[in-house]
Amino acid sequence: MKQTFRFIKPIERITHLKPNATMMLFLASVLAVIMANSSLSTIYHEILEYPINLTIGGHEVFSHHGETMTLLQFVNDVLMVIFFLAVGLEIKQEILVGELSSFKKAMLPIVGAIGGMIVPVLFFLLVVHEGPGARGAAIPMSTDIAFALAALAVLGSRVPASLKVFLTALAVADDIGGIIVIALFYSSHINIGMLAIAFGILFIMYLMGRMHVSNLGLYFVCTFFVWLFFLQSGIHTTIAGVLAAFMIPARPGLHAKNLRAEMRSLFEAMPNDKIRQSGSSLILSHNQINVINSMRKIARKAISPMQLMEEYLSPIVGYFVLPLFAFANAGITLGGVTADALWGVPMAVFLGLFVGKPLGIYFFTYGFVKMRLCPWPEGMSRLNLMAVSLFGGIGFTVSLFIATLSYAGAEHLLFLNEAKLGIFVASIFAAVVGIVTLRYELNLENAKAQKS
């Protein structure tokens, strides 16, 4: 049987995500809401205020503006760097071999993402255009790729592959826009010296890649120091994760085409030493173990540091970082939101995500196709596009993150609480209406196919 070796495109990997990670994210969010609105609320807030400290040589590593980080700050300023490191690796893969690897492929998802960022901001500002509440205008810009794909997966194998590809590429382009917004608008009091040191370490990482250094431990250590100096520089630390990801080399030590030949030669060199066996127990000879270890090293060399790091980070992000982030940030206090306040930030976020986001994605995409600037995506109808645009309105993770940046500090706590409410309601509406719309379209197509 003929076999071929190739990169597993990130689009394929992301669209086959295990649902368990998304379920953990959902359950962590529900737990946070329950605790924040019950007799456990005091315990919940005490957990978030728990100090996290690590002292090395008299220096507090996890300190924020000279103060020891709380668990909430640790999650948002440290653990989310790991999330954005993983996001950066996915973006790099998309640019290299995925749906953003050529101008023709990338144009439509990027156009859709731009529309999905501009229009939600306009809808937000129509409702809240002045005062401290307007600081959250960027909140409805983001799409939560995990929840969006989970909503798409509800309809099973009937969903055309082109829809999954377009939605994933759209979300990746959306992430790029979100990262730029964080870098430009959520950084203050920039320390040029610290920033210069951070970029110096990034340059060292780049040189390591050029010199074919494949030791992941070295890249993780460098990333830690890049984060540390970004923390002191005034630029938000999540940008450190993205920039570090771009420095991780995508070139493997052994080309995949040569892997089979290397493995065959090692397999042929396997000594015919007697294998000692007792029941289900097997004892290999030292020579056999040496050959098997050589096979392991050769196989590892065939995977680039970029993909290897992404494989390591994926379960950590999915099963630890994002659920903990959701638990720390999703605890909206429903009793603190008044009926009058619903027409402020909550409505602005809701309209931005549920109305502005889908309309922006749909009309920018459809407009470019009608102007013949881009070809229509294969296998996608106008109703399909509207459904995918609705899934783009599922904000959640990154929207919550931008909300915490927009309304930082005790004086903005009420706005933060209101923004969370808007994110929750809009994401649920977008998911439900998107599923209903796509199900209707798929049933319509199925009925037409049966008639013909």
From Swiss-Prot:
One of its GO terms (molecular function) is sodium:proton antiporter activity. Na(+)/H(+) antiporter that extrudes sodium in exchange for external protons. It is a multi-pass membrane protein. Belongs to the NhaA Na(+)/H(+) (TC 2.A.33) antiporter family. This is Na(+)/H(+) antiporter NhaA. It catalyses: Na(+)(in) + 2 H(+)(out) = Na(+)(out) + 2 H(+)(in). GO terms for cellular component: plasma membrane. GO terms for biological process: regulation of pH. It is found in: Cell inner membrane. Pfam families: Na_H_antiport_1 (PF06965). It comes from Porphyromonas gingivalis (strain ATCC 33277 / DSM 20709 / CIP 103683 / JCM 12257 / NCTC 11834 / 2561). The chain crosses the membrane at residues 23-43, 71-91, 108-128, 136-156, 165-185, 189-209, 216-236, 316-336, 349-369, 385-405, 418-438. Keywords: Antiport, Cell inner membrane, Cell membrane, Ion transport, Membrane, Sodium, Sodium transport, Transmembrane, Transmembrane helix, Transport. The keyword Cytoplasm does not apply. It comes from the Bacteria.
